[in-house]
Amino acid sequence: MALWTRLLPLLALLALWAPAPAQAFVNQHLCGSHLVEALYLVCGERGFFYTPKARREAENPQAGAVELGGGLGGLQALALEGPPQKRGIVEQCCTSICSLYQLENYCN
């Protein structure tokens, strides 16, 4: 009984110092399997769109190929455009940091 009364104030302090579940997750770098697990956590039963890279390549082996059609004119147009702007979940949550609210945008 005496041990319990000594531990109670310590447990109360730990409970006050512990971050709320949403605050513990607010802004993080999430890459690979950690990103997928976070999406499972956030989306729950709604689910999210996910196709593993190996499966994507098996279904469409030409998906990564760049088609330049148009000869030299096509190359010049690509050179003027610069690198493509990537705005996917990997750029948003792995390269940069993202919040739970940003992850929810990728739920079904």
Curated annotation (Swiss-Prot):
The alphabetical list of record keywords is:
Carbohydrate metabolism, Cleavage on pair of basic residues, Disulfide bond, Glucose metabolism, Hormone, Secreted, Signal
**In the UniProt record, does the keyword Secreted occur?**
yes
Give a yes or no for keyword Phosphoprotein in this entry.
no
Entry's Gene Ontology cellular component terms: extracellular space
InterPro entries to which the protein is assigned, alphabetical? Insulin, Insulin-like, Insulin-like_sf, Insulin_CS, Insulin_family
Question: Got any disulfides in this one, which pairs?
Answer: 31-94, 43-107, 93-98
Give the highest taxon in the source lineage. Eukaryota
Where found in the cell?
Secreted
| Propeptide section residues | 57-85
Family, per entry: Belongs to the insulin family.
| Name under which the protein is recorded | Insulin
Question: What is the species of this protein?
Answer: Sus scrofa (Pig)
| Underlying gene | INS
